Amino acid sequence: TVILKNGDELDGKTLWSDPTLDLAVVKVNAVNLPAAKLGNSEKLTVGETAIAVGTPLGLQFQHTVTSGIISALNRTVQIPTERGENFMEDLIQTDASINPGNSGGPLVNLKGEIVGINTVKVVSAEGIGFAIPIDVAKPIINHFIKQGKFTTPYIGVVGFDRQIASYYKQNKDIMAGVYVVNIDPKGPAYLAGIRIDDIITMVGDQPVN
């Protein structure tokens, strides 16, 4: 059920979801609905104002608005998923309050433009929350508008780049590419011959960096 600001309730249908990206597309059959403008997360700067909207801790606190700043950009966070441990990358870090239930709500700038989608917070600390940049969601949205569906690419590896490998004290001198730390034994990469400890430097003729 999708509940609008005026209290109207609409039936929602989940067209697509991906727990790894922590994103979903929900469709409602209605017309003339107001829509928020999508901003450009590439233009964000550290220190600018960020406003988070959501429903923390249940419906009794729906439409809660909190504010803060953009604390950092391009953060990487390790989270558990149904596929095992996953690394969410390129996240926006903010000190605007994000609590359970805020996930999926918008992070907006002072123009009211959506620049991110709230996702997770560090439970052991206050003032450290994260949002998915809206530019990550835009291709998915556009694909749905044009084709009515979206298939999540999946190769079945967990990889560290040079910076993350160094952070986790992996003794690998990686100058380029991605170091494979885990692999799905039923996934495409394994079937193609990729193994743990490999370094992927090219996919076809496309460099991996």
Q: What spans do the regions from the language model cover?
A:
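Serine-dependent protease modules
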Residues: T1-K169, I174-A176, V181-P185
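Conserved PDZ fold ligand-binding element
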Residues: A189-N209
